[in-house]
Amino acid sequence: MTLSNEWYNTELENSELETLHRSPTVEYSFYNAVRSGDMEAVIKNCSEDEFIRLEGTGVLSRNALTNIKYHFVVTTAMLTRYCIDGGLEPEQAYRLSDFYILKMDSCKTIRQVADLHHEMAKDFTGKMILQKKSSILSKPVMQCVDYIYSHIKERITIQVLADHTGLST
């Protein structure tokens, strides 16, 4: 059977069972709370274990642990992009994402994945709070911070940063 035929059969089955995905509004609200640094809303979401309430989220794996791990990766990727859009330095956001996805790999239970999700969400939220506080920094200082994150393993001098920002030393 071709993938196209298999997809068609799955669609027929889902429509007969009236399997529907929930509205993404709740997810978007969570992502926006993280992006805006609303720690109170994020803590409330985590304390209510919204992450492991999967009704209407779609089945990404028939194995419950693998399914929640896939949802973790999706959530982490979305939070990363929302936070970058909100002003978090891209390299920092991607490294944080990689860190948590690698940590998730070693989780053995759904509870461990959920607890790690909550830590990850609060970590991204905390970074957004700090980012907003640091937004009072000048553009050249922020350009330097971005450059340093992107070239973290290289030797960086004041002259290199001056050249990068177009300022003199």
Q: What are the language-model segments listed below?
A:
Residues V145-Y149:
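Helix-loop-beta hinge of the Bergerat
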Residues M1-K127:
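Hydrophobic, helix-rich cores of sensory/ligand-binding and other regulatory modules
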Residues Q131, S150-T169:
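Basic/polar phosphate-binding segments, predominantly the helix-turn-helix DNA-binding elements
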Residues T80-C83, C144, L161:
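Generic hydrophobic/packing signal
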Residues P90-R95, I136, T157-V160:
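Short acidic alpha-helical/loop segments enriched in Asp/Glu that coordinate divalent cations
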Residues I136-C144:
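N-terminal positioning helix adjacent to the helix-turn-helix/winged-helix DNA-binding module
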Residues A64-T66, K132-L137, E154-I156:
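Conserved short strand/loop->alpha-helix "switch" segment adjacent to the catalytic nucleotide/phosphoryl-transfer site
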